[in-house]
Amino acid sequence: MSRVGKLPIAIPEGVKIGLNDLEVKISGPKGELSKTFKGNIAISLAENKLLVKPLAANKNVRAMWGTARSIISNMVTGVKEGFKLKLEINGVGYRAMVKGKYLNLMLAKSHNTKIEIPSDIKIEMPKQNIIILEGTDKEKLGQFASIIIKQRPPEPYKGKGIKFENQFIPRKEGKKN
């Protein structure tokens, strides 16, 4: 039994759910999300709660059971409240700015890095070294954040690079004479 999978998903007010076999469409005040699931999973709606149940007892189906429930729960949270990620840029001369539909990163390379911003993600920049990402889809938000971080991951000696707001970077000692 999956401890995560057997929990029902409460549906808050203002969120509408559409079920079509293994396709789930969820719409709310922040937007609309849809996802098609594979595997032997049954998704049902009863008394303002979504239930996810496995149709087989093998290991792969049980693994997908909890995963599917978590994805649907994140979709409900996303269309109701949305998700927010905060990234910090550390380093002398490291900064970012939004130009149109591109995020322009200046990270001590010979060229500036331009990353296209997906249409369903909003970017706020209170300072040149802080990037706040907002969106309804937690998976796409995390993917976009990892693309940004991959441009200059934090290094352990001086701590320069792009990292999540509260991410701990283990520091190393430099060379000793």
From Swiss-Prot:
UniProt cross-references to Pfam families, sorted A to Z: Ribosomal_L6
GO biological process: cytoplasmic translation
GO cellular component, one term: ribosome
Gene Ontology molecular function terms on file: rRNA binding; structural constituent of ribosome
InterPro entries: Ribosomal_uL6-like (IPR000702), Ribosomal_uL6-like_a/b-dom_sf (IPR036789), Ribosomal_uL6_a/b-dom (IPR020040), Ribosomal_uL6_bac-type (IPR019906), Ribosomal_uL6_CS (IPR002358)
Annotated Gene3D superfamilies: Ribosomal protein L6, alpha-beta domain
Keywords per UniProt: Ribonucleoprotein, Ribosomal protein, RNA-binding, rRNA-binding
HAMAP family: Ribosomal_uL6_B
Family recorded in the similarity comment: Belongs to the universal ribosomal protein uL6 family.
PANTHER family documented for this protein: 60S/50S RIBOSOMAL PROTEIN L6/L9 (PTHR11655), LARGE RIBOSOMAL SUBUNIT PROTEIN UL6M (PTHR11655:SF14)
Summary of subunit composition and partner proteins: Part of the 50S ribosomal subunit.
Function: This protein binds to the 23S rRNA, and is important in its secondary structure. It is located near the subunit interface in the base of the L7/L12 stalk, and near the tRNA binding site of the peptidyltransferase center.
Protein name, UniProt field: Large ribosomal subunit protein uL6
High-level lineage: Bacteria, Pseudomonadati, Pseudomonadota, Alphaproteobacteria, Rickettsiales
Gene: rplF
